[in-house]
Amino acid sequence: MVKQIESKTAFQEALDAAGDKLVVVDFSATWCGPCKMIKPFFHSLSEKYSNVIFLEVDVDDCQDVASECEVKCMPTFQFFKKGQKVGEFSGANKEKLEATINELV
């Protein structure tokens, strides 16, 4: 299941609640074509990797979160463990997304 993040507070709470689990964050926008293309795949990964937390941040709804995380383009995927960023890449690359999850989990 993918949790939609609505605020900076909710983002911080989700990172804190994850504990030792890997957190994958999809920074996207409704108007972004590549974001729409990879969204179903991102959701399918959340079903496949039940031990990983999947979050979705709409950069237009949560500009403060996107800015704090220094997101420059969409989609950007960031990976967190124990509240610290441990990985990041931009672009709708399905293979890289799953490979990065496998590497960090």
From Swiss-Prot:
GO terms for cellular component: cytoplasm; cytosol; extracellular exosome; extracellular region; nucleoplasm; nucleus. Keywords: Acetylation, Activator, Allergen, Cytoplasm, Disulfide bond, Electron transport, Nucleus, Redox-active center, S-nitrosylation, Secreted, Transcription, Transcription regulation, Transport, Ubl conjugation. GO terms for biological process: cell redox homeostasis; cellular detoxification of hydrogen peroxide; negative regulation of protein export from nucleus; negative regulation of transcription by RNA polymerase II; positive regulation of DNA binding; positive regulation of peptidyl-cysteine S-nitrosylation; positive regulation of phosphatidylinositol 3-kinase/protein kinase B signal transduction; response to nitric oxide. The record marks D26 as: Deprotonates C-terminal active site Cys. In the fully reduced protein, both Cys-69 and Cys-73 are nitrosylated in response to nitric oxide (NO). When two disulfide bonds are present in the protein, only Cys-73 is nitrosylated. Cys-73 can serve as donor for nitrosylation of target proteins. Changing C73D: Strongly reduced S-nitrosylation of CASP3. The modification N6-succinyllysine is found at K8, K94. The active site is at C32 (nucleophile), C35 (nucleophile). The modification S-nitrosocysteine is found at C62, C69, C73. InterPro entries: Thioredoxin (IPR005746), Thioredoxin-like_sf (IPR036249), Thioredoxin_CS (IPR017937), Thioredoxin_domain (IPR013766). Residues 2-105 form the Thioredoxin domain. The record marks G33, P34 as: Contributes to redox potential value. Changing E70A: Strongly reduced interaction with CASP3. It comes from the Eukaryota. CDD domains: TRX_family. The modification N6-acetyllysine is found at K3, K39, K94. Its main location: nucleus. One of its GO terms (molecular function) is protein homodimerization activity. Induction: Up-regulated by ionizing radiation. Disulfide bonds join C32-C35. Changing D60N: Loss of pH-dependence of dimerization. It is found in: Nucleus; Cytoplasm; Secreted. Changing C32S: Loses its reducing activity, interaction with APEX1 and transcription activation. Belongs to the thioredoxin family. Homodimer; disulfide-linked. Interacts with TXNIP through the redox-active site. Interacts with MAP3K5 and CASP3. In case of infection, interacts with S.typhimurium protein slrP. Interacts with APEX1; the interaction stimulates the FOS/JUN AP-1 DNA-binding activity in a redox-dependent manner. This is Thioredoxin. The gene is TXN.
